[in-house]
UniProtKB/Swiss-Prot annotation:
Subunit field text: Homodimer.
Domain of life: Bacteria
Reaction catalysis annotation: adenosine + phosphate = alpha-D-ribose 1-phosphate + adenine; S-methyl-5'-thioadenosine + phosphate = 5-(methylsulfanyl)-alpha-D-ribose 1-phosphate + adenine; inosine + phosphate = alpha-D-ribose 1-phosphate + hypoxanthine; adenosine + H2O + H(+) = inosine + NH4(+)
Protein task: Purine nucleoside enzyme that catalyzes the phosphorolysis of adenosine and inosine nucleosides, yielding D-ribose 1-phosphate and the respective free bases, adenine and hypoxanthine. Also catalyzes the phosphorolysis of S-methyl-5'-thioadenosine into adenine and S-methyl-5-thio-alpha-D-ribose 1-phosphate. Also has adenosine deaminase activity.
Pfam families per UniProt: Cu-oxidase_4
Enzyme Commission code(s) on record: 2.4.2.1, 3.5.4.4, 2.4.2.28
GO MF annotation terms: adenosine deaminase activity; copper ion binding; oxidoreductase activity; S-methyl-5-thioadenosine phosphorylase activity
Name of this chain's protein: Purine nucleoside phosphorylase SACOL1200
Binding site for Zn(2+): 79, 124, 141
Database matches in CDD domains: YfiH (cd16833)
Amino acid sequence: MNDNFKKQPHHLIYEELLQQGITLGITTRGDGLSDYPKNAFNMARYIDDRPYNITQHQLQLAEEIAFDRKNWVFPIQTHENKVACITKDDIGTNIDTLTDALHGIDAMYTYDSNVLLTMCYADCVPVYFYSTKHHFIALAHAGWRGTYTEIVKEVLKHVNFDLKDLHVVIGPSTSSSYEINDDIKNKFETLPIDSANYIETRGRDRHGIDLKKANAALLIYYGVPKENIYTTAYATSEHLELFFSYRLEKGQTGRMLAFIGQQ
């Protein structure tokens, strides 16, 4: 696949950004220690897996991306739209064990160097933000709830520079095969973007939704230049050899870890 995300042993990396001091990527599912599912490279401590496995996977990833795990930060995601400002004081949060810190956070941003923002995914959209000019990075977790509640808009509220200097990467997530019902479709139709561009009715109470397109449309609506947004062609629901898919695997699966940091 011709994509800016390049395959590595246990992750995909946005390779061209490395020269700019940005480490941006997402883990893949295979060649791990977990039995959930078998031989999975699961990165989530909050599912039925041995803590040892997660720690070993973290150490492996830290070596592959050359970013010490002591500098990672992980929130407790709850499918909402709250954003946290992260500083070097937060590094190490929820990496060895889960705590009450950063609970209910589905987006983070920082202007600090040597901090790796991380969150878990298994169909939801990872939205990465960066500006090398202003030394800003952010990461958002946008499932249908986060998309509907405009989590990308909430992140943009914390950008204190001209949006022409902001770049956004929309990462691997479910495709338009993801279906919603009438009630959820009606919610999306209240957003300030044309739902016809990302929702397709397929039958009674059945509508396909492309959450990548919805988030891109929201970003453009709120002022991010279209040419500054990159959307990967990778889809969790279409590349099960690479990714976990919560919906296709009926919840019995692991989680990938999306990450972004700046040197």
